[in-house]
Curated annotation (Swiss-Prot):
Single GO molecular function: S-methyl-5-thioribose-1-phosphate isomerase activity
Function of the protein: Catalyzes the interconversion of methylthioribose-1-phosphate (MTR-1-P) into methylthioribulose-1-phosphate (MTRu-1-P).
Site residues by UniProt (Transition state stabilizer): 170
Pathway: Amino-acid biosynthesis; L-methionine biosynthesis via salvage pathway; L-methionine from S-methyl-5-thio-alpha-D-ribose 1-phosphate: step 1/6
Gene Ontology CC terms, in alphabetical order: cytoplasm; nucleus
Name of the coding gene: IDI2
Alphabetically ordered keywords of this record: Amino-acid biosynthesis, Cytoplasm, Isomerase, Methionine biosynthesis, Nucleus
Compartments in which it is found: Cytoplasm; Nucleus
InterPro entries: IF-2B-related, IF-M1Pi, IF_2B-like_C, Initiation_fac_2B_a/b/d, M1Pi_N, NagB/RpiA_transferase-like
Source organism of this protein record: Zea mays (Maize)
Catalytic activity: 5-(methylsulfanyl)-alpha-D-ribose 1-phosphate = 5-(methylsulfanyl)-D-ribulose 1-phosphate
Name listed for the protein in its UniProt record: Methylthioribose-1-phosphate isomerase
E.C. number(s) listed in UniProt: 5.3.1.23
GO biological process, one term: L-methionine salvage from methylthioadenosine
Length: 367
């Protein structure tokens, strides 16, 4: 069972999981076998797989593979506890992305309820495996809905433009999800509809997800695209080359504040200054209503080597020995800089009354 996109970060069939090692792209395409939750944890932490939706699916499936042939001796309640603890462990691999913790919570609730009526531990694992597999299928469908909603909305908002050029950041395509993509899914939909002039992508330092992954996907699918340095984005907007910026999200607070790849905040400020529309594109699982604002979002800090060495820390040292490093993986873009939030349920726009997002009000009827 796998997504149908030509580029697949996750290749799964029951009892087997292979993850595309995205650290080696675009020069090599190598898949790594994942046979346990420990393998999954390491793959997520080491960024073999990345992207908020993808890591949630990869984590869930890693545990599904582990329990598919597990010789477990215990009651249904003990099996549910085993699954729950493994999921807690997997969540610790990357704390900023809410998709992972959201998926874990849903799966924990599911197996706990199943344990109330299950006759043996094997049936608990079966329930878990089927639920994890459903998440994989649903993610692709949700991504395509995001792309469709986003493309239609952008065309309405930019009706005066015969064709639309957009800028995107990091990687939000089929490599960051189970298939198709979120922000890159919108770009795909615009291209399929014949209204995309060009997609610009940032290199996205220090791990270069834009130059290594997004550029790779765009070239692979023959979408007209241009790669720019992160520091060239403001100049690009000033010269009028883009009408919109579209980014993904790792966590969206109740007020619309959005945590995404470091550098997103810079782009939002530049977009506001140059009157360029700024869109966040993400599944509703990226929304965390328990957080009133982005101030409460935990920001992961990564290894200094990503800045000290070339190739996002994988190459030779390029910085002076002894220099201190601050390397946050994400930043938080305030809601007032965001034009709208594109989800699989539709587009969340700001209220006329005070210009804020009523995300809770949007989600209640959508569920």
């Amino acid at each position: 069972m796998a997504a149908s996109d030509a580029l697949q970060s996750i290749v799964y069939s029951r009892g087997s999981l292979r993850l595309l090692d995205q650290r080696k792209l675009p020069l090599e395409m190598e898949y790594i076998d994942v046979k346990s939750s420990a393998d999954g944890w390491n793959a997520i932490r080491d960024m073999v797989v990345r992207g908020a939706p993808a890591i949630a699916i990869a984590a869930a499936l890693a545990l599904a593979v582990e329990v598919s042939d597990l010789d477990f001796i215990g009651t249904p309640e003990e099996a549910a506890s085993f699954v729950s603890k493994k999921l807690e462990y997997l969540v610790s691999s990357r704390p900023t992305a809410v998709n992972l913790s959201d998926a874990a919570t849903k799966l924990q609730t599911l197996v706990s309820k199943a344990a109330e009526t299950a006759k043996d531990s094997k049936s608990i694992f079966q329930v878990y495996i089927e639920a994890a597999e459903t998440m994989l299928v649903d993610d692709v469908a949700d991504n395509k809905a995001i792309g469709s909603h986003g493309a239609v909305f952008l065309q309405r908002q930019l009706a005066n433009s015969k064709k639309i050029s957009v800028l995107t950041h990091c990687n939000t395509g089929s490599l960051a999800t189970a298939g198709y993509g979120t922000a890159l899914g919108v770009i795909r939909a615009l291209h399929s509809g014949g209204v995309l002039e060009k997609a610009f992508c940032t290199e996205t330092r220090p791990f270069n997800q834009g130059s290594r992954l997004t550029a790779f996907e765009l070239v692979h699918e023959k979408i007209p695209a241009t790669l720019i340095a992160d520091s060239a984005a403001a100049a690009l907007m000033k010269q009028g080359h883009v009408q919109a910026v579209i980014v993904g999200a790792d966590r969206i607070a109740a007020n619309g504040d959005t945590a995404n790849k470091i550098g997103t905040y810079n782009l939002a400020i530049s977009a506001k200054h140059h009157s360029v529309q700024f869109y966040v594109s993400a599944p509703v699982t990226s929304i965390d209503l328990s957080l009133p604002s982005g101030d409460e979002i935990v920001i992961e800090e990564r290894s200094p080597k990503e800045l000290l060495n070339s190739e996002g820390g994988l190459g030779k040292q390029v910085a002076a020995s002894g220099i201190s490093v601050w390397n946050p993986a994400f930043d938080v873009t305030p809601a007032n800089l965001i034009t709208a939030i594109i989800t699989e349920k539709g587009v969340i726009t700001k209220t006329d009354a005070d210009g804020s997002f009523d995300i809770k009000g949007f989600l209640l009827p959508a569920k």
